[in-house]
Regions:
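Bulky hydrophobic segments
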Residues: 2-173, 178, 192-205
Length: 205
């Protein structure tokens, strides 16, 4: 790969990441805010049925006082960003099983021409923050062993990816691709590795 092709690849990846963050930001923030109301309804039922003002005050107090609540809110936000990217911002496909294997490299052939694609790299990058935030949120339950963290982060990304692909298949939003599941899982393991590195660095400080 030449220097120009490398720069084009990095530029395309950066552009797609910024678009993926910018487009659904407000929607994801609102969805996460509403999702945490369901959490409060399930785990703080004493505050239910007292009007919307009381509900908002309870939400704010819980967000201010509970570290776990803030972690869950951030996890809901990251999850909704991914859901928007993979499901809500997609066109309908007549045949979701038209490309089951998917793309496994950064080059693809379209109408006999070789074209650069960043899909596999973006699938890896997409799951890194997700699995890292999952480990951060449930780290106390999972434990500190790096092997266990990598296993759990990879498993979380794999299950989440399978869920997304099945929804794409059932709703005809995009195509079901095995390569997506593989690269998402790799991204999940990398997210777990990043979490391990950050926790290790924090202990040294």
């Amino acid at each position: 790969m030449t220097m120009k092709e490398t720069i084009d690849l990095l530029g395309k990846i950066l552009t797609n990441i910024l678009i993926a963050l910018y487009e659904p930001f407000g929607f994801s923030l609102l969805l996460s805010f509403l999702a945490m109301f369901f959490y409060l309804y399930a785990y703080e039922p004493t505050a239910a049925g007292k009007g919307w003002k009381s509900a908002i005050v309870t939400w704010y107090q819980k967000f201010k006082e509970s570290v776990f609540f803030r972690k869950l809110f951030f996890l809901a936000f990251v999850t909704s960003l991914i859901m928007f990217r993979t499901l809500l911002n997609r066109q309908l496909w007549m045949n979701p099983l038209s490309d089951v294997m998917g793309g496994w490299g950064i080059w693809e052939t379209v109408n006999g021409e070789r074209q650069l694609t960043t899909e596999c790299i973006e699938n890896v990058i997409m799951m890194v923050p997700f699995s890292a935030v999952v480990m951060w949120t449930f780290g106390e339950k999972i434990g500190n062993g790096w092997k266990k963290i990598l296993w759990q982060s990879g498993k979380a990304a794999f299950i989440f990816s399978i869920g997304i692909e099945m929804l794409q298949l059932l709703l005809r939003l995009g195509t079901f691709q095995l390569s997506d599941i593989f690269y998402n899982t790799v991204g999940g393991v990398l997210g777990g590795l990043m979490y391990c590195a950050v926790m290790k660095a924090r202990k040294r400080l």
